[in-house]
């Protein structure tokens, strides 16, 4: 019996694959447990439509991330903080601080988790990476000045 795997099954294959399984194994285990469904015309058509919709959504997300990366490229933000002697700041600059400043200055809303930042504990200029999508990232310049 041909079945479409709905989940990864260690011994059979990955989600979305159409495989041949014995009738008893498919009817008594795979289908009732939700690991697979019968591979008839209707289910194959539904599965192909779902895959196509996911592919289109992924392309739209990549396009939006590339557009945002182009918009962010070369942007510069200024943060003013209290500092002690030798230019050492009190506390540290976080992704949330940078995200809030980007939103305030450029009206660009970026999740703080997408901002890759090392510990910034000194006054100065830093290049900060913003990961918008797994393979799409850009750098912005962050200038830390004393209040």
Swiss-Prot record:
InterPro entries: Ribosomal_bL9, Ribosomal_bL9/RNase_H1_N, Ribosomal_bL9_bac/chp, Ribosomal_bL9_C, Ribosomal_bL9_C_sf, Ribosomal_bL9_N, Ribosomal_bL9_N_sf. It comes from the Bacteria. One of its GO terms (cellular component) is ribonucleoprotein complex. Pfam families: Ribosomal_L9_C, Ribosomal_L9_N. GO terms for molecular function: rRNA binding; structural constituent of ribosome. Keywords: Ribonucleoprotein, Ribosomal protein, RNA-binding, rRNA-binding. GO terms for biological process: translation. Binds to the 23S rRNA. Belongs to the bacterial ribosomal protein bL9 family. This is Large ribosomal subunit protein bL9. It comes from Clostridium kluyveri (strain ATCC 8527 / DSM 555 / NBRC 12016 / NCIMB 10680 / K1). The lineage of its organism: Bacteria, Bacillati, Bacillota, Clostridia, Eubacteriales.
